[in-house]
């Protein structure tokens, strides 16, 4: 970039590439791959001399100062001062270009006219509405008529640890703002008195693919990442992983395969809530709203739900506007919803859209670019353009 293309802007490293790796692969820590034998300061020095200006995820000045001293010893103080000033110019240039030094103070009146500006808020909210996908609408239950009485079960969230190692206690609470729901519908805690049930769940969460207990029991530590709630055994996984094991934290492990291992989603209670709600509602309709961060295997509950909505990080009001008909769904699936975990395991990493997509009880295929509006399956210029599938792997 610096020599061939003449780039003189800021180059920032990926996060934590100068830090040491965690003790186990599931620990979100350093990624000093290829330079594990160097000290932290030596890694900084190598990055600086390669032409980078900024260290992603590193707030410690000590290793940078040590790297400077290394450079002085090898190249002299004048050369290292010039190298540091070169990065300083690149970094400060961006600050000067937006006037932060010349005009560091905000005009409060001007800010209030910009921040929270109605037209900006409307644009953001409209974007949320346009991202919500209606997957199933049996008998055209949706939109719900005004005055309907809804039952919304509480959602159980088990104690869990996220990717960064942060822990959260278990909780049982309503998954949406009930005061907001009451502005749209009548609400009851008794399913027998409800016209319809509205169940809010999150997509299956089976963890990050590594389990210390598996390692302690003699395994390699790697377990499946499942897209279904119920227990899944990886019978169709590779016997030998593409990745070459853990050369740093565990050199004895040369295979990350999880073939034959079983995992269950931490939030399997979401599936139980759907099924229990259907049993409580008997013949009355159940609407499932899934907040997704990955595709999901909906075969476990699809037949028990009259309606299924998929969302990707929207506020409660947007979902309620769709359910109530204040807004019509127009979004298309940005992913395939797999028929089962077998097709997930067998898909090719370099070929998009090569999974077997789920077909629901209404005959609709939850493929890439599928979605419903109030009239039925959406067929427009978007579906004409995006429902094309590549046939072969990339070379």
Stretch-by-stretch model annotation:
Residues 4-6, 12-21, 37, 64-78, ...:
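C-terminal non-catalytic regions of proteins with extracellular/luminal or membrane-system context
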Residues 4-128, 346:
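Active-site or pore-adjacent capping/gating segments
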